[in-house]
Amino acid sequence: MGKEPRDGGADVEAVYARGQSGNYPDPYLTPQDLRDLLDRCQGGDKLICNIEAYEIDGEFDIPRIDLGLYAGGVSELVRRWDERLAETTDFIESLLDAVAEEQNPIMFIVWLDKRASA
């Protein structure tokens, strides 16, 4: 049997460069991958704007909307970049703390937003 997305192991640099994690059969991001991607976004020209979280329970990948981030609307786009980055960073750090308390593994798919050229 081949490797499944739930096995993790996303290439964080490729995710950053592409602006999103892949779709099936690309691997999900693990919590550590998400932390590494967040670190990569600091000082860069992208930020994480959307996160889909999945609880891995046996053979099922259960969507966890309560652990997701859904941003990127017009109201987001008019805010200063540093404000958006700080808010996203705070959210993801809190999210990772919550995920650490979960019984089953939590994995992620993400989308990034690129800073508009000045």
Question: Could you describe each region identified by the protein language model?
Answer:
Residues 1, 48-51, 55, 108-110, ...:
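Generic preference for hydrophobic/aromatic residues in regular secondary structure cores
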Residues 1-31, 40:
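Long, contiguous N-terminal structural blocks used for assembly/anchoring
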Residues 10-13, 65-69, 84:
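Amphipathic alpha-helical segments in structured regions that serve as interaction surfaces
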Residues 11, 33-36, 87, 91:
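Exposed alpha-helical structural elements
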Residues 24-72:
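Amphipathic alpha-helical interaction modules
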Residues 76-80:
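Intrinsically disordered, low-complexity coil/linker segments enriched for acidic/polar
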Residues 81-118:
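Amphipathic alpha-helical binding modules
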